[in-house]
Design a protein with these regions (language model features):
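N-terminal auxiliary segments of SAM/dcSAM-dependent transferases
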Residues: 1-22
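Conserved class I S-adenosyl-L-methionine
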Residues: 61-69
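Conserved SAM-binding loop of SAM-dependent methyltransferases across substrates and taxa
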Residues: 72-83
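A short glycine-rich, Lys/Arg-flanked "PGG" loop and its adjoining helix->strand segment in the class I
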Residues: 147-159
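Substrate-binding/catalytic lobe of Class I Rossmann-like enzymes that use SAM or dcSAM, i.e.
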Residues: 169-229
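A short acidic, Gly/Pro-enriched loop at the edge of an enzyme's catalytic core
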Residues: 121-132
């Protein structure tokens, strides 16, 4: 529910910008980086990640991009400045939205980038975007509402648009309680308790792909970037 999500986000993210900056660095990117070599710094790998997204999204100037679950707004600000994209970020984390707004101002892209502090369920439907990104936010939606959320993303996307989804999950296992599979079970429980409070990252890749295709998406490519964590 929206009430539950606000409670979880407030306890996990709000008023903790200093804490997150200690291990996320100046770019404040919470999702996986992308290391081209083991000698790269965290900031280099974070920038690699953004540029990889831009490449996969086939971004061009004046694209209209919606980032659902924009965190501290780094992707929104970076793509607006370096790719000339018109970006809109969505988050319910007040502290993150304030950081993002300040970052947009520092990047000098107030005319191209903005952040809405609203629940993803309340994203206006009167406008469509030709590019949509969702980086490790769908886990917070949960299994029950995942397909409905994917349908929402599909409906917000232009007919020839591109949707970039990054999502965490477990490997396909018939019985997680078996001794040989308990590592995945423990990983999932740890993530839910300490990393993504209230989130569900328990489903295998084929589960995600099936639901993407059922709402109308055509899957163009899949890349496993788990080792970059």
């Amino acid at each position: 529910s929206q009430k539950q999500d606000k409670r979880i986000i407030k306890s996990h993210y709000d008023n903790k910008n200093d804490l997150f900056s200690w291990f996320l660095g100046s770019k404040m990117i919470y999702t996986s980086c992308y290391f081209k070599s083991i000698d790269e710094s965290l900031e280099d790998a974070q920038e690699n990640k953004i540029n990889l997204i831009a490449q996969k999204m086939q971004l061009k100037e004046d694209d209209e991009l919606l980032d659902i679950g924009c965190g501290w707004g780094t992707l929104v600000a970076h793509l607006a400045k370096h790719y000339g994209v018109n970006t809109t970020g969505v988050t319910i984390a007040q502290a993150g939205a304030e950081w993002a707004t300040r970052q947009i101002r520092e990047y000098g892209v107030e005319d191209r980038a903005k952040v809405w502090t609203i629940d993803y369920r309340d994203i206006p439907t009167d406008k469509k975007y030709n590019k949509i990104t969702c980086l490790e936010m769908a886990e917070h939606v949960g299994i029950k509402y995942f397909k409905k959320f994917m349908k929402q993303c599909y409906d917000l996307l232009e007919d020839d648009g591109i949707f970039y989804l990054q999502i965490a999950g477990l490997r396909e296992r018939s019985n997680l309680l078996q001794k040989k599979n308990r590592e995945d079970l423990v990983w999932g429980l740890f993530m839910n308790e300490y990393i993504f409070s209230g989130a569900d990252a328990s489903m295998p890749l084929n589960w995600d792909l099936q639901r993407l295709e059922k709402v109308g998406f055509e899957v163009h490519s899949v890349e496993n970037i788990g080792n970059h964590y």
